[in-house]
């Protein structure tokens, strides 16, 4: 069968496999590529090539992740798989690999285990919109009632963490069976991919969201005015658009009179572009690195929020000792560095290096924040943790 030419016409979705250790996440990832490769939709990836995940650095944290890509009849997928539990926690909290949805793998022989629960909670905290369940190792369970019981437990667990437990697709299969070419189990992998295609929503494209650009640098051009440079995070900006300048306590409105990229003048800039924006009536000292330019009324500066964070271990270059309530590190949000005070959850005395915890943060001045924003926690110039905002308080 001739391989289809890779067309970029299919919508792109980022997904991953999550779940308890040894429940078959990597085997399933290999099985998906193997089954789809037979249909000319993927390159075959062996278990070993996925399991020996390369190290990546994200916000100063080293994470092992494997990236696999494949397509279905409807979509193109980038799929991330992590070998170790700690890698998952770091990956999900730092957003090293953004997930638009995930396949949670649970062994029918064990049912939901502690990490199954932890990964579902993390997926909820970091706003993974939908999960699909793959019940693995069903070829090792003879009792149909046992399968029913595991499915019921999974639905209850999903509902407990505010996922749609009643309607989430649950596919009963065997990743190893599919990898070994057993037709019955290959069909289950195809069924899983159909469920992923229909249940996991297409993510909104960054260009379709409202305009936002964190300011990296500012300079003035004699006779023309002030230019703010940075990478556009979301949306599109046109010459003549009104914008708001937020952060550091001084909010101001202005109009973009020029968009420049690689020394060329453009009519517009869009998400992902590194641009310089010429701003009308703004003095060079009224705007500085760390501020945010955005569409008026979209986002507000806040100083207090809740966040899900991962604190680096000593071996990862993090702290050697725990920290206690009222710890005051630097928070690196977009292009802004700001001191903040951490309040620990009630009953938590201290946080050890390697912990994953929910904290409340109060910054010393308001900064443009939104739910889902990722940040690094730094101390003395090194990264000691990373996290993302789950709730804005003030």
Swiss-Prot record:
Listed Pfam families: GTP_EFTU, GTP_EFTU_D2, GTP_EFTU_D3
UniProt key word 4Fe-4S: no
Location of region: G1: 19-26
Residues annotated for GTP binding in this entry: 19-26, 81-85, 136-139
Molecular function per GO: GTP binding; GTPase activity; translation elongation factor activity
List of residues binding Mg(2+): 26
Reactions catalysed according to its record: GTP + H2O = GDP + phosphate + H(+)
One GO CC term, this protein: cytosol
PROSITE patterns: G_TR_1, G_TR_2
Entry annotated with the keyword ATP-binding: no
EC number: 3.6.5.3
Keywords from the named record: Cytoplasm, Elongation factor, GTP-binding, Hydrolase, Magnesium, Metal-binding, Nucleotide-binding, Protein biosynthesis
Quaternary structure annotation from Swiss-Prot or TrEMBL: Monomer.
Function statement: GTP hydrolase that promotes the GTP-dependent binding of aminoacyl-tRNA to the A-site of ribosomes during protein biosynthesis.
Family, similarity comment: Belongs to the TRAFAC class translation factor GTPase superfamily. Classic translation factor GTPase family. EF-Tu/EF-1A subfamily.
Record-given protein name: Elongation factor Tu
Species per Swiss-Prot/TrEMBL record: Bacteroides fragilis (strain YCH46)
The encoding gene: tuf
């Amino acid at each position: 069968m001739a391989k289809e030419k890779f067309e970029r016409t299919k919508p792109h979705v980022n997904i991953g496999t999550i779940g308890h250790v040894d429940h078959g996440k990597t085997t399933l990832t290999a099985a998906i590529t193997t089954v789809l490769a037979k249909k000319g939709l993927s390159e075959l990836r062996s278990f070993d090539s996925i399991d020996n995940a390369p190290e990546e650095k994200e916000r100063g944290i080293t994470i092992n992740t494997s990236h696999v890509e494949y397509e279905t009849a409807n979509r193109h997928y980038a799929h991330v798989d992590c070998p170790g539990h700690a890698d998952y926690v770091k990956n999900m909290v730092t957003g090293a690999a953004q997930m638009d949805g995930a396949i949670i793998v649970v062994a029918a022989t064990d049912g939901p285990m502690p990490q199954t629960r932890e990964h579902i909670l993390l997926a909820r905290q970091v706003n993974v919109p939908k999960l699909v369940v793959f019940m693995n190792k069903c070829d090792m369970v003879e009792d149909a009632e046992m399968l029913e019981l595991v499915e019921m437990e999974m639905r209850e667990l999903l509902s407990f963490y505010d996922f749609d437990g009643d309607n989430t697709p649950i596919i009963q299969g065997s990743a190893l069976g599919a990898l070994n070419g057993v037709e019955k189990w290959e069909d289950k992998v195809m069924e899983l991919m159909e469920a992923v295609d229909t249940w996991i929503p297409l993510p909104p494209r960054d260009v379709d969201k409202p305009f936002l650009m964190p300011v990296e640098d500012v300079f003035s051009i004699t006779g023309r005015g002030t230019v703010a440079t940075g990478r556009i995070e979301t949306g599109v900006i046109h010459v003549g658009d009104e914008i708001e300048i937020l952060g550091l306590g001084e909010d101001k409105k202005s109009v973009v009179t020029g968009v420049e990229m690689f020394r060329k003048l453009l009519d517009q800039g869009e998400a992902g572009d590194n641009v310089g924006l010429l701003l009308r009536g703004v003095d060079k000292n009224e705007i500085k690195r760390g501020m945010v330019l955005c569409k008026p009324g979209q986002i507000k500066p806040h100083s207090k929020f809740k966040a899900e964070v991962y604190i680096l271990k000593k071996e990862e270059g993090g702290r050697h000792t725990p920290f206690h309530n009222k710890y005051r590190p630097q928070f690196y949000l977009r292009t802004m560095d700001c001191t903040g005070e951490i309040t620990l959850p009630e009953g938590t005395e201290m946080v050890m290096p390697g912990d994953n915890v929910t904290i409340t943060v109060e910054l010393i001045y308001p900064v443009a924040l939104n739910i889902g924003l990722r940040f690094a926690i730094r101390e003395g110039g090194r990264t000691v943790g990373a996290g993302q905002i789950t709730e804005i308080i003030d």
